[in-house]
Structure formats: C-alpha cells, structure tokens
C-alpha cells in the first residue's frame, strides 16, 4: 500500500543554512510550519553557505532532481551580487536552474533579493562596492529574476519591497551585519509562507511506499 507525502527540497545559500541564527534558517521555519499543517512532510535541505547561482547549478541541482521533489524553494543571488557576477551571467544560471527544477514536475518557489544596500555590511564594503552600485546591481538582478520567473512559470517571493522596512530594523541582522538573525529568518519565512502554500496546493501527488 502507499500513502501520499510531501517532499520539500530547498536549494540556496547561507540563508537556508541559518548562518547567524538557528540551523536551517528560513527553510527550517518553513519546514516546521509545514509539519504542523500537513502529514508526511519530508525535507531535503541542500543549501550551502557561500553558494552562488553557479555553484547551486553545479552542486545542488542534480541532487535535487534525483529526489523527485514536489515543492522546491530556491534562494540565491546575494553572493553573486557581492562577487561581481554580471546580471547576464546570473540570469543565464538562473534560467538553467529553473529549467532543471521545472523538469522534475515540482512547483518551484524563488525569492528575489532584498535591498542589501541597507545592510550594515554594505557601508563597510563601500570602498570596493559603492552603495549606488549595490542598488544598481540589485535592480538588475531582480529584473533578471522576474524574467526567469515569468519564462518558467515559477512562483515568486518578494523580499525586496518589505526589506526597506525590515532591514533597517535593529534586530533583522546578526552581529556580523550581513547574515540575518533568528528574527530576520522568521521574517523571511513569513514572506515565503503564503507562496509555499500555493505551491503545495498545486504540487504533484507522488505515492510513498509504506509497510
């Protein structure tokens, strides 16, 4: 006999690892909330601290595909932003990621980037990445993400608009001024949650063997 389960796979960077806060970051908050609302939920969290769109593509995508996920979250781009990846390279990587994830039949949820020019670390880094350039790059990266979301029929999470209120708040960031605190990860999860719910409702049913 079989029973239906929900297989959730998360891809991304340190925000899915929980650097600066509780292990698992926003992904763990989402998983625990899913477990409270659904039976038989499983999580495979593939997020790696320091990941870029290129390393998610090379190191996480194939593992995600092998699991036949039903819902996927993908949060990546901040490290691309800081490391000089061009918007065109980022968009190309995200296109390939989206195509590979959609091919599994899963419903795919992707977040855009918050306004990291408001992060404390941005002011410390201004000597090599001036604030106006950070703002310009965030706009270009988010425009690229919007195009990828539209092309592949993904579900988008807006972290950018609320970041103008949330990031200046005193408790959003951990002590390093770059990674979120527990409170920051909770806020991220709140923005993901309604979109993840929609993804779950539209997710393909896949039987899980039991007994």
What would you call each of these model-derived segments?
Residues 1-50, 59-68:
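Serine-esterase "nucleophile elbow" of acetyl-processing enzymes
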Residues 14, 20, 49-52, 79, ...:
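Gly/Ser/Thr-rich beta-alpha loop segments that engage phosphate groups in nucleotides
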Residues 23-25, 52, 135, 158:
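A short linear-motif detector with a strong N-terminal bias
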Residues 55:
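Active-site-proximal substrate-binding core of FAD-dependent oxidoreductases
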Residues 58-211:
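Alpha-helical cap/lid subdomain in secreted, periplasmic
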